């Protein structure tokens, strides 16, 4: 065995300096690049052929490993921050957020407790408090950054169930129920499955909006079994905003936890163009918003905010002898507020970006996407062979081409990516195939979108 092999990976040596320089050089080039291609996936067989085995007893070396990543693995990944990545909900992290993500890893930070990470917890909490204020929640509101909307929704709904259990005492129903729109995000059903509770989906009208009349009927039907009503502030498929104010008004007659799934759309509250559409959010018991979607942070981050953080803490604090020094303290430990213990301070890139550029820059960037969605919606209506499925509410634009089948949309989508013109995957609504632009990147232009529409002629 080679002398000092046990410490080779951790000492500062010429090898260490070289690999750090390699990684920083690549990161600098990628962050400052202005012509990064969309790229495209390839097959497992092809990746194995090109890369060969990389995990061996002796390793392939840092230079070879980075070369494999840069020239083989990375080109097999679609570039999610490309201005013409318009599928799902894209990610467009700011340059500051991307750069600071390196700092977070380099600093060996733990973001689970105040004891171990007071500085970063303070920074994250400043962002969470600012968001809570933007959403109209009280100064006492607070929460934690988790992995994504699925984790955020699950953590909030677990807290809601815990609060309902404490409220009812021994009078527990046979099955707990979550009330939500039939168009709610799939993560709500996923959370219910993990929690072993039922979902009561409420039908919407043609506009896809969850309204108080349907929620009232569900509350009457299920009574105390309801642990939460989930309203969506910007559905993934259309950007539809439920009637949150009307649903919140039901709290005058019914006692329920109101959770707002704003993973994509709630960020639009920062824009003066859309703020008025979110009336009622201030009455929520919990909300989520994903900074890696429309707040321009890197993957992955979801801000989970409780109206009363103590309810989140009671539901999620983990207890063990070795944790006594943390759990017996009244200091703010983020791991007490979600289904996690070990956590990276994933809110820091957003903090650095907000601190660097200021909130007004964020408002302008979000407004750009909303304006662009309205502009391209108008353009679509001018084209005789295209039709809007719904008027754009935020920055998602859904449209159909006359006489196209699902196969036509798929061929068109495949051709766009093959030609490196755009990444637009087909979608559907009520069994009808369609096309969909999800616009969050401030570098996406009207001309970009018109160019894509022209390929449908």
Role assignments for model-derived ranges:
Residues 139-140, 389-395, 429-434:
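Short Gly/Ser/Thr- and Asp/Glu-enriched loop/turn motifs at secondary-structure junctions
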Residues 141, 384-388, 421-426:
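A short linear hydrophobic-aromatic micro-motif
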Residues 254, 429-457:
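PLP-dependent enzyme catalytic core of the Aspartate aminotransferase-like
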Residues 183-185, 206-207, 234-236, 265, ...:
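Short, glycine-/Ser/Thr-/acidic-enriched flexible segments
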Residues 2-140, 422, 435, 444, ...:
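N-terminal entrance/gating region of PLP-dependent enzymes' catalytic architecture
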Residues 148, 152-313:
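Conserved PLP-enzyme active-site core in the AAT-like
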Residues 279-384:
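Active-site C-terminal subdomain of aminotransferase-like
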Residues 387-416:
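Conserved PLP-binding catalytic core of the aspartate aminotransferase-like
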């Amino acid at each position: 065995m080679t002398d000092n092999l046990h410490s080779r990976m951790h000492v500062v040596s010429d090898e260490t300096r070289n690999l750090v320089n390699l990684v920083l050089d690549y990161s600098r080039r990628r962050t400052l690049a202005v012509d990064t291609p969309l790229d495209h996936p390839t097959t497992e067989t092809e990746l194995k052929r090109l890369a060969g085995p990389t995990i061996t007893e002796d390793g392939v070396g840092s230079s070879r490993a980075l070369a494999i990543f840069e020239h083989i693995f990375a080109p097999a990944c679609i570039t999610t921050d490309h201005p013409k990545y318009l599928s799902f909900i894209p990610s467009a992290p700011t340059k500051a957020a991307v750069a600071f993500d390196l700092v977070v890893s380099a600093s060996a930070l733990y973001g689970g407790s105040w004891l171990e990470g007071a500085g970063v917890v303070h920074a994250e909490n400043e962002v969470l408090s600012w968001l809570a204020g933007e959403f109209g929640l009280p100064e006492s509101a607070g929460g934690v950054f988790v992995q994504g909307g699925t984790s955020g929704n699950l953590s909030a709904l677990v807290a809601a169930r815990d609060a309902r259990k404490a409220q009812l005492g021994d009078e527990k129903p046979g099955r707990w129920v979550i009330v939500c729109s039939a168009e709610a995000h799939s993560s709500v059903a996923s959370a219910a499955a993990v929690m072993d509770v039922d979902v009561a989906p409420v039908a919407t009208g043609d506009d896809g909006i969850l309204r108080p009349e349907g929620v009232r009927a569900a509350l009457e039907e299920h009574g105390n079994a309801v642990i939460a009503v989930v309203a969506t502030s910007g559905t993934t498929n259309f950007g539809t905003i439920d009637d949150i104010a009307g649903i919140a008004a039901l709290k005058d007659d019914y006692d329920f936890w109101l959770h707002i799934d704003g993973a994509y759309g709630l960020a639009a509250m920062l824009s003066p163009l859309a703020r008025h559409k979110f009336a009622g959010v201030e009455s929520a018991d919990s909300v989520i918003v994903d900074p890696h979607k429309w707040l321009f942070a890197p993957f992955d981050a979801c801000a989970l905010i409780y109206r009363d953080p103590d309810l989140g803490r009671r539901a999620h604090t983990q207890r063990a002898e070795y944790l006594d020094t943390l759990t017996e303290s009244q200091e703010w430990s983020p791991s007490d507020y979600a289904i996690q213990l070990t956590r990276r301070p994933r809110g820091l890139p957003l903090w650095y970006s907000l601190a660097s550029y200021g909130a007004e820059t964020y408002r302008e960037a979000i407004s750009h996407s909303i304006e662009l969605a309205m502009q391209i919606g108008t353009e679509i209506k001018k084209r005789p062979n295209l039709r809007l499925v719904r008027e754009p509410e935020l920055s998602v634009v859904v449209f159909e081409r006359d006489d196209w089948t699902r196969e036509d949309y798929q061929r068109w989508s495949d051709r766009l990516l093959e030609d490196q013109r755009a990444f637009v995957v087909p979608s559907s609504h009520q069994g009808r195939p369609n096309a969909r632009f999800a616009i969050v990147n401030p570098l996406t232009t009207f001309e970009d979108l018109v160019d894509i529409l022209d390929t449908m002629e």
